[in-house]
Amino acid sequence: MSAYIIETLIKILILVAVFSALGGFATYIERKVLAYFQRRLGPCYVGPFGLLQVAADGIKLFTKEDIIPQGANKFIFTLAPIIAMVSAFVSMAPIPFFPNFTLFGYEIKPLISDINIGFLFFLAVGAAGIYAPILAGLASNNKYSLIGSARATIQLLSFEVVSTLTILAPLMVVGSLSLVEINHYQSGGFLDWLVFKQPLAFVLFLIASYAELNRTPFDLLEHEAEIVAGYCTEYSGLKWGMFFLAEYAHLFAFSFVISIVFFGGFNAWGFIPGGIAILIKAGFFVFLSMWVRATYPHVRPDQLMNMCWKIMLPLALLNIVLTGIIILI
């Protein structure tokens, strides 16, 4: 077995282990952040500052009975959370998380694969995760799950169109779909960040990413007040945990991608080294998603569709036209 294959396998194992751990810890952070905004304590009983709440939740999920409803399609019911997990982790393959570094005289590239269409690969594979809520809802033999899967189809497909059109303008400026090249394009300094050249694209992509991630205020797929837990209504134990681990893994992936595409990625930020800089940026966008969840109310399905097709889509197309004109001039 070649050294390249061994290195790639090690990277995959590290990526899955790290982001699985981060996904579990993110539940604790989010509960603490929401508690702060709502003037309460959040997790505080299990361990110091409630830090062992993550371990307690993990033990609970692993030991709960795995229930499959009567009349459900067992194979598809089991396959759905696996699709969610695979989609979330495979989409991370082209993301350069840190600058290259040397270990024992061997140069390490902290990404799985530097493919020329890295950004498109990230969006396409991430969008394949739409099959998870669709299949979960169809296989559960539950009306609330079915409504949740129908909402998933409409919401995720609609905003996938917007996010794909939104990234065209920044890609026209850079001239490459590779996330490594996009990061390198912004290596000249603070003023080279694409957020200053494409502010509208940044805002549209950020909003579309929240809709694709099923984050508040766009969490119509599992809106408790209307459809119980949506497509997850009949899930319990480890399968339920897999859905939400995939959601947090996607959140971290989008946070890194937004940091790379619009905020200079892992290029050094003044006196701050590049590796620390990208962690600060990605951490901020994870926190921002939690802040938005604590601040904004849910939107109605009709409001969501109106915003997508009547506001965001025309703005994305306008941004493409204006960017093309500026480049030609």
From Swiss-Prot:
The chain crosses the membrane at residues 9-29, 42-62, 75-95, 117-137, 154-174, 188-208, 238-258, 269-291, 309-329. PROSITE patterns: COMPLEX1_ND1_1 (PS00667). One of its GO terms (molecular function) is NADH dehydrogenase activity. One of its GO terms (biological process) is aerobic respiration. GO terms for cellular component: plasma membrane. It is found in: Cell inner membrane. Keywords: Cell inner membrane, Cell membrane, Membrane, NAD, Quinone, Translocase, Transmembrane, Transmembrane helix, Ubiquinone. It holds the Pfam family NADHdh. It is a multi-pass membrane protein. It catalyses: a quinone + NADH + 5 H(+)(in) = a quinol + NAD(+) + 4 H(+)(out). Its EC number is 7.1.1.-. Its main location: membrane. It comes from the Bacteria. Belongs to the complex I subunit 1 family. NDH-1 shuttles electrons from NADH, via FMN and iron-sulfur (Fe-S) centers, to quinones in the respiratory chain. The immediate electron acceptor for the enzyme in this species is believed to be ubiquinone. Couples the redox reaction to proton translocation (for every two electrons transferred, four hydrogen ions are translocated across the cytoplasmic membrane), and thus conserves the redox energy in a proton gradient. This subunit may bind ubiquinone. NDH-1 is composed of 14 different subunits. Subunits NuoA, H, J, K, L, M, N constitute the membrane sector of the complex. This is NADH-quinone oxidoreductase subunit H. It comes from Helicobacter pylori (strain HPAG1).
